[in-house]
Amino acid sequence: MIFSTVEHILTHISFSIVSIIITMRLISFFLVDGIVQLYDSSEKGMIVTFLCLTGLLVTRWTYSGHFPLSNLYESLIFLSWSFSLIHIVPYFKKNKKYLSTITGSSVVFTQGFTTSGLLTEIDQSSILVPALQSEWLIMHVTMMILGYASLLCGSLLSIALLVITFRKNKKILYRNNLLLNESFFFVEIEYMNERSNLLQNTSFFSAKNYYRSQLIQQLDYWSSRGISLGFIFLTIGILSGAVWANEAWGSYWNWDPKETWAFITWIIFAIYLHTRTTRNPKCANSAIVASIGFLIIWICYFGVNLLGIGLHSYGSFTLLAN
């Protein structure tokens, strides 16, 4: 009884903190530079959230007698913990606000869904099914969830890169079209005046473009690092799962829906890494592949559970009925 109470308290404390954090981040976003202390407070709040989630996992492990990764609810808690772990690392390195924004938002939405009440029955700890009563549980599922977390963060950074690149190209195209229209519809003197004004603002646009280019490079750098790390975790998770499957079911691979989509996920990010090995890699091309991978991960991790079929059906769930 006491363990359930502690778990309930830790769950709602972590959710309350991340809800406050997202509000603080919105305030910081709209007020821009004036709220440095507010940003630092949100970072400290994420550390408290990490500690609460750690305590939640330890508590659930203690009273259930097994590592808390036996169903979707527990894996979502662990996914939130993984996001918060990734989040606090750049906090100590400083000057990585865009990365911590991605990871912080991921914690908010994951933890929000976990504690929303949409998941029924599986939020209660139960005895492991025979197939899960193995030492491979910790190795396989931990590596897979850490891989998902790293890949999702890297993919979100790639999506942010695409948005910034698209807006940059759109502004350049608009400016070129504006000058072209002026050359047709205005007299030569007015056109030269516009050109003169444009040259006067060159330093402003150059500085702005420089910082935008630096941001794109940083997003590309951290995206590739996150995806590379996640790909390693995913590979280890798939290989350990194959060994576990051979022990449990007598076959290394059964083309189960979960296994199939995990393999598709691995292929997508293998393609991403391949695009990074070319002599002159283009950020946008690899970012497009990573964006596709973002959708594939959610299909693999979450969408397949909606089916409730296959050898991994014990991870399925039901939504709260009206």
From Swiss-Prot:
Instruction: Give the domain of life.
Output: Eukaryota
Per the UniProt record, one Pfam family is Cytochrom_C_asm
Subcellular location(s) per record: Plastid, Chloroplast thylakoid membrane
GO biological process: what's one of them?
Answer: cytochrome complex assembly
A GO-annotated cellular component? chloroplast thylakoid membrane
What's the protein's topology in the membrane?
Multi-pass membrane protein
GO terms for MF: heme binding
What residue ranges are annotated as transmembrane? 15-35, 45-65, 72-92, 98-120, 144-164, 226-246, 253-273, 287-307
Q: Which UniProt keywords apply?
A: Chloroplast, Cytochrome c-type biogenesis, Membrane, Plastid, Thylakoid, Transmembrane, Transmembrane helix
InterPro entries linked to this entry: Cyt_c_assembly, Cyt_c_biogenesis_CcsA, Cyt_c_biogenesis_CcsA/CcmC
Q: Which family does it belong to?
A: Belongs to the CcmF/CycK/Ccl1/NrfE/CcsA family.
- State the oligomer form and interacting partners: May interact with Ccs1.
What is the purpose of this protein?
Required during biogenesis of c-type cytochromes (cytochrome c6 and cytochrome f) at the step of heme attachment.
Q: What is this protein called?
A: Cytochrome c biogenesis protein CcsA
